């Protein structure tokens, strides 16, 4: 029987999570993409603590875009999460694409975060 798209994403994410782990020195930049919004968190997996977060639902970005499901909105989230991470002294991260393909909104967020100063 054919897998649904959600099942495929979940299987890919579990394979990725076996290899990618955030440490205090190099936390994990985790991305979650829904149909309407995109979310990014910088996570220390050892302490199980979210250090920085940003999404299209943030008060800083809420009214800027007609939809949170665009590459432009993803770029804004990438820049915002990078600025917040750099403000806390986090420069190096490990990228966790959350089982999604590195394309479209995921790629836009990653490139914007890199341009804003995060190293991964």
Curated annotation (Swiss-Prot):
Residues 1-24 are annotated as: Disordered. The keyword Ion transport does not apply. The gene is rplR. The keyword RNA-binding applies. This is one of the proteins that bind and probably mediate the attachment of the 5S RNA into the large ribosomal subunit, where it forms part of the central protuberance. PANTHER family: 39S RIBOSOMAL PROTEIN L18, MITOCHONDRIAL (PTHR12899), LARGE RIBOSOMAL SUBUNIT PROTEIN UL18M (PTHR12899:SF3). The lineage of its organism: Bacteria, Bacillati, Cyanobacteriota, Cyanophyceae, Oscillatoriophycideae. This is Large ribosomal subunit protein uL18. It comes from Gloeothece citriformis (strain PCC 7424) (Cyanothece sp. (strain PCC 7424)). GO terms for cellular component: cytosolic large ribosomal subunit. Keywords: Ribonucleoprotein, Ribosomal protein, RNA-binding, rRNA-binding. One of its GO terms (biological process) is translation. GO terms for molecular function: 5S rRNA binding; structural constituent of ribosome. NCBIfam families: L18_bact. InterPro entries: Ribosomal_uL18_bac-type, Ribosomal_uL18_bac/euk. Part of the 50S ribosomal subunit; part of the 5S rRNA/L5/L18/L25 subcomplex. Contacts the 5S and 23S rRNAs. Gene3D superfamilies: 3.30.420.100. Residues 1-10 have a biased composition (Basic and acidic residues). HAMAP family: Ribosomal_uL18_B (MF_01337_B). Belongs to the universal ribosomal protein uL18 family.
